[in-house]
């Protein structure tokens, strides 16, 4: 799976704690090799992220993405569960 990042995602990722950034890199690398790996807990979202999906970065942090086509995912948001889904 090809991965691209929205500018907003890059800005949000830049504000993450160092250990979370490291975990993010690991999880997105895993996602690019195996998007349905059970560790990622990949799942579809509802309002306000209709037609988007989420993967777990840590127990607290999630990354939200949209599928552009069969082989490309656009990551749009990253943050804590409570911040993203309030």
Question: Predicted regions span which residues?
Answer:
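A short, surface-exposed loop/turn module that caps and links secondary-structure elements
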Residues: 30-55
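Enriched for short, Lys/Arg-rich terminal
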Residues: 2-7, 11, 15, 22, ...
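N-terminal non-globular leader segments, chiefly Sec-dependent signal peptides
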Residues: 15, 23, 29-33
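Hydrophobic alpha-helical segments, especially transmembrane helices
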Residues: 22-24, 28, 42, 63
